[in-house]
Amino acid sequence: QVRDDARAKTLVFTWELTLDYSPVKYPVRMYVTLPDGGELLQWNIEADLPAGWLVTDLKFPNVVIERPEDGRIITTEGWGVEKPLDIATFEARYPSHASAMQFLVVHNAEGAFYYGTEDRRGCGKTYSAQCTPTTVALSDAIPASAGWIADGTFRLPWVSVTGFTPKGWEDAVVRWYRPF
């Protein structure tokens, strides 16, 4: 489904799941939004739940990009660490010394792909970049809170954002991390 309102366009992906022994289907909705005039895609998720059910943890979003030739990853460990994109998994728990800010950047000479969360509360999460010979999958593992459920619907209380700039990692971080 495509939603077009006064300030943004949103793709809504809906899955219907059977979660208990009833014939009732429970929708899970993923929203990918581009605000009018915006540069970053915003990702969010919500799910309707049976009475008394909780979401205890989730991995969201899982954004897969082509692994850039001669690519490197920037994590926010300490004052920032840049590493080659080896075939490995990079993980960093936020907030901690291993992830002092809420983003990862994959870059090479062609530009920078920015992945971050706009979580003003600073909730715990583990940033992950899983590298294969051809792809990089960026995601967050999130321990969920019962407080994120209202009227039987779980909703992640922040958006994750993605964007690309040909101007490099410094442009991505200065332009997109600071404003939120």
Language-model features: where?
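Carbohydrate-recognition beta-sandwich/jelly-roll modules
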Residues: 1-180
